[in-house]
Regions:
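Surface-exposed molecular-recognition determinants
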Residues: 2-203
């Protein structure tokens, strides 16, 4: 069989693709979408709450993520404060024992530490301080917050003058309707503190 040159065969109509995915349905990895942001204009707030979560997002999103840049306001500017979280209005200053937390902590001068808290009224996600103007940064993932067949698991990563990685369990199978953030010692949030909530769509 003779070999025929395409240059002489009259094949002039063709399509050129620059991607190996041509003709195939693209597969896009999941991406978190910004849902809400709260920026505090003044330092008179001690609790920041995101509400109506299940009714607004439960049918669309599988996981929630919070990204936080915050600091506890302090009269003397030299007070350290833990950042804590509670859900569905259960916990916080209202007391209770629905949360259990485990943290790995890296302190610059003291090395590594492990901390555990059980049967507390909040989940502990990290550390914020008013000392020297330091702000705390946090990433908080709430896994399957709208499931009603298992307890809710939360994982967190935070950084300030020390770094922490941890997780906690909220011992309740109810769908999450609200998430609240609060510093301990009844400290208010510093002006300019920012908390953004993202959602990862269900498959």
């Amino acid at each position: 069989m003779a070999v025929k040159s395409l240059a002489r065969s009259g094949l002039v109509t063709y399509s050129k693709y620059s991607s190996m995915h041509a003709g195939n349905t693209p597969i896009l990895p999941g991406a978190y979408e910004l849902l809400e942001t709260q920026i505090l204009a003044n330092s008179t707030t001690d609790v920041v709450t995101f509400s109506s979560l299940n009714s607004t997002y439960g049918s669309t999103y599988q996981h929630l993520m919070f990204r936080i840049n915050a600091k506890a306001a302090s009269v003397n500017g030299n007070t350290a404060a833990a950042m804590r979280i509670y859900m569905n209005g259960i916990g916080g200053d209202g007391g209770g024992s629905s949360y259990a937390t485990h943290l790995l902590r890296q302190i610059n001068s003291s090395g590594q530490q492990s901390q555990a808290y059980s049967s507390t009224s909040y989940g502990y996600i990290g550390f914020s301080t008013a000392q020297f103007g330091n702000w705390g940064q946090y990433i908080v993932d709430i896994l399957d917050p709208f499931e009603t067949t298992k307890n809710t698991t939360v994982r967190s990563l935070s950084g300030n003058t020390e770094e922490r990685f941890g997780d906690f369990r909220y011992s309740n199978v109810a769908a999450i309707t609200s998430v609240s953030f609060q510093h301990d010692a009844s400290l208010q949030f510093e002006s300019g503190s920012r908390i953004s909530m993202y959602g990862l769509r269900s498959a």
